[in-house]
């Protein structure tokens, strides 16, 4: 069994989601018999490990759920360099979402240090996080994408009125979001010019680029892709897609992570042909971006044609997340999924 450090938390708006993901990963890895070291990345940039672990409590001792919860209430931060020099882990399992945890930053940090990690590499992480660049790659690979525009803060500051007029050409409703973001934390459904002007000003208070995209009415589905080695060969498989029935106007943050916020139906209630097509396109998106290990792509099916929305390189791994739901529907345990992710991370570091 391996010594595995689990990174979760982070400074992004998805901090709370990542904590839930980290807890799920730690518990699952522990049931697999691995030695688990939970590492909380705080919102202010600190790196925290359970206090008793840092005074040489064995790996196994920090796997108690009670100790885990109690110790994170009274931890002290450690510097990144002190932490890395004493990491003593075979691989880092990334349970981060959004921001520097998913945009290639932490991946680059670990790569420079020569520390193996799970999930996609630097380039794929950065491309997938940049919604505009990702859409351009999807279009080049032949995928259908709803019309969109990107706006930079400088252009908006110089001419707010022209920016609003440009985005109005997409029609209403439209979806406005930061170019680099995930989990629909800052995604807004815009229905009129006044709302568009107001939300642009608000988003640019904290983000440098935004993207707005035309609304598509249809069936929303999400499809996970897993990589694994079988008989010495790497293979990619698409999981059964999940149909998303939002409790609100769209599948926003509340719908994704609040109990009862949405209905998630796995497998999706779509035709066999549509399911096959969605799975093919999910693998295509995974491959086009250069993802590794796993990913999850979201689509809207309009008139039988899937239109891709985005690809997540570090999809959620909470109790209610879609990848665990889809793996279960495919007869694959999360222990199998995690074992494959670890194997791929270790093999890639060797190459």
UniProtKB/Swiss-Prot annotation:
Keywords, sorted A to Z: ATP-binding, Cell shape, Cell wall biogenesis/degradation, Cytoplasm, Ligase, Magnesium, Manganese, Metal-binding, Nucleotide-binding, Peptidoglycan synthesis
Superkingdom of origin: Bacteria
Binding site for Mg(2+) 1: 298, 310
Domain ATP-grasp: 135-343
Cofactor note: Binds 2 magnesium or manganese ions per subunit.
Cellular localisation: Cytoplasm
Catalyses which reaction(s): 2 D-alanine + ATP = D-alanyl-D-alanine + ADP + phosphate + H(+)
Molecular function, one GO term: D-alanine-D-alanine ligase activity
UniProt binding sites for Mg(2+) 2: 310, 312
Signal peptide: none
Any one GO biological process: regulation of cell shape
Pathway assigned to this chain's UniProt record: Cell wall biogenesis; peptidoglycan biosynthesis
Family under the similarity heading: Belongs to the D-alanine--D-alanine ligase family.
Chain's role: Cell wall formation.
Name under which the protein is recorded: D-alanine--D-alanine ligase
Organism from which the protein derives: Leptospira borgpetersenii serovar Hardjo-bovis (strain JB197)
Gene behind the chain: ddl
